[in-house]
From Swiss-Prot:
Protein name per Swiss-Prot or TrEMBL: Ubiquitin-ribosomal protein eS31 fusion protein
Site (Interacts with activating enzyme): R54, R72
Residues carrying the site annotation Essential for function: H68
Cross-link (Glycyl lysine isopeptide (Lys-Gly) (interchain with G-Cter in ubiquitin)): K48
InterPro entries listed in its UniProt record: Ribosomal_eS31, Ribosomal_eS31_euk-type_sf, Ribosomal_zn-bd, Ubiquitin-like_dom, Ubiquitin-like_domsf, Ubiquitin_CS, Ubiquitin_dom, Ubiquitin_ubiquitin-like
Length: 155
């Protein structure tokens, strides 16, 4: 049977084939006529690209059908180089989990009474849960910078 192959230039070539011929055979015949290597050829019929291992009858290609020949495009996006960093990556700080850490803030005396070792900041800006640092003669809040000086009887 006779089929037509339309190239990109608009030129139509005729090929004598059998329905049992594979797509590879058709590409070889196109190479004989046009000189285009089979690995660069893409044949399209009814909007589908024809795969090499299949036959013409698999795609229901009948006599006087027209195949479209396009050239294969190689490659894709440009390959990017791997970046070389001059300084090593900074290691993220991992918070250490200490069991019963809350016990550092309280002291239990021999009578069983609980005393707070640190003082909470009284500022409205800080709120509850912000403890003040204990200095030699004062308490200091690192968040709002409030300082409370000890009296002799406070210690």
């Amino acid at each position: 049977m006779q089929i037509f192959v339309k190239t990109l230039t608009g030129k139509t070539i005729t090929l004598e084939v059998e329905p049992s011929d594979t797509i590879e055979n058709v590409k070889a015949k196109i190479q004989d006529k046009e000189g285009i290597p089979p690995d660069q050829q893409r044949l399209i019929f009814a909007g589908k690209q024809l795969e090499d291992g299949r036959t013409l009858s698999d795609y229901n290609i009948q006599k006087e059908s027209t195949l479209h020949l396009v050239l294969r495009l190689r490659g894709g996006a440009k390959k990017r180089k791997k970046k070389n960093y001059s300084t090593p990556k900074k290691i993220k700080h991992k918070k250490k989990k200490v069991k019963l850490a809350v016990l550092r803030f309280y002291k239990v005396d021999e009578n069983g009474k609980i005393h707070r070792l640190r003082r909470e900041c009284t500022s409205e800006q800080c709120g509850a849960g912000v403890f003040m640092a204990v200095m030699e003669d004062r308490h200091y809040c690192g968040k709002c910078h409030r300082t409370m000086v000890f009296k002799d009887d406070d210690k």
